[in-house]
Swiss-Prot record:
The lineage of its organism: Bacteria, Bacillati, Cyanobacteriota, Cyanophyceae, Synechococcales. Belongs to the tRNA pseudouridine synthase TruA family. This is tRNA pseudouridine synthase A. Homodimer. InterPro entries: PsdUridine_synth_cat_dom_sf, PsdUridine_synth_TruA, PsdUridine_synth_TruA_a/b_dom, PsdUridine_synth_TruA_C, TruA/RsuA/RluB/E/F_N. The keyword Disulfide bond does not apply. Formation of pseudouridine at positions 38, 39 and 40 in the anticodon stem and loop of transfer RNAs. Keywords: Isomerase, tRNA processing. Substrate binds at Y125. Pfam families: PseudoU_synth_1. HAMAP family: TruA (MF_00171). One of its GO terms (molecular function) is tRNA pseudouridine(38-40) synthase activity. It comes from Prochlorococcus marinus (strain MIT 9313). Its EC number is 5.4.99.12. The active site is at D67.
């Protein structure tokens, strides 16, 4: 039987909803969503589910549609099945059929009313910047290497805090979005430096198409003093999308988790499971940036 082929089911066959906590290394995927003539996380996961439950067409629904090259530490997915596999056995069963770049950390039974995307009350992303002098091969797949100057994370934090609340973020939305509007609520922001690594976390009710990477490009320009706060604020408040040109590369971005009104997974299987990096001894710090450009 071919994956996702549809057969007539007995009327008594119960349909169950399964929730998954999923990790993936996004470098070789076109993103979460199925695309013609490209390999997506959704396609690979659905094909694996169909091998275990071939009785019905499978649709895997995710909390966030990550772009090509973006990673996930705690993506949340649901699908409906009618086979006999207990909920808690789906994780090991799927991991035996998935490539090593996709791992299911936990599987739980959910009511039919629960939806991985629509029931989520927030999504949280982390962007990692490697701000050291020398390239590091083992950080390349997971971070953006900025080595020209030492980033001013204080300036970046000030800019981030100004974004909190319900705002129109048209300036940070790529063309091609199907959303009717560009308003969303940023609930929490955080920036942390650990030696040569800067980790920026942003949590919101939802994100626009390409929003985080466009925002990170602007923050790095701020941190390098190629952009000042006044110009940054004017760009997004006045919706000057044409002036927001540089998007941060995909490999530094990771979907940490999606949150719900109730805890769906155990904390160990879901919460902040992207590793923190330790580089050992750091090189001498980079020179600070020059004064910000005037507007």
């Amino acid at each position: 039987m071919f994956p996702n082929s549809k057969v007539e089911l007995p009327k008594s066959t119960p349909v169950r909803r399964i929730g998954l906590s999923v990790q993936y290394e996004g470098s070789n995927f076109c993103g979460w969503q199925r695309q013609p003539q490209a390999v997506s996380v959704q396609q690979v996961l659905e094909d694996a589910i169909s091998q275990l439950d071939p009785q019905r067409p499978i649709q895997a629904v995710a909390a966030g549609r990550t772009d090509a090259g973006v990673h996930a530490a705690g993506q949340v997915v649901h699908f409906d099945c009618c086979g006999p596999i207990p909920a808690e056995r789906w994780a090991p069963a799927l991991n035996g059929r998935l490539p090593s770049t996709i791992r299911v950390r936990e599987a739980v039974a959910r009511p039919a009313s629960w939806h991985a995307c629509h029931s989520a009350i927030y999504r949280r992303y982390r962007y990692t910047i490697y701000n050291g002098r020398r390239p590091n091969l083992f950080l390349t797949p997971w971070s953006w290497h900025r080595y020209q100057v030492r980033l001013d994370e204080t300036m970046m934090q000030i800019a981030l805090e100004g974004l909190l609340g319900l705002q129109d973020f048209s300036a940070f939305q790529r063309t091609g979005s199907r959303r009717a509007h560009a308003r969303t609520t940023i609930q929490e922001v955080k920036i942390e430096r650990q030696g040569d690594l800067i980790m920026i976390e942003i949590q919101a009710s939802g994100f626009l198409y390409g929003m985080v990477r466009l925002l990170m490009g602007q923050l790095v320009a701020l941190g390098e003093h190629r952009l000042n706060l006044e110009t940054f604020e004017r760009r997004w408040k006045e919706k000057r999308r044409q002036e927001v040109k540089e998007a941060a590369p995909a490999q530094g971005l990771c979907l940490l988790r999606a949150g719900y009104e109730e805890d769906i997974f155990s904390k160990g299987g879901w919460y902040d499971c992207q590793p923190r990096y330790s580089l050992g001894a750091n090189d001498p710090p980079l020179d600070p940036p020059s004064a910000p450009e005037s507007s």
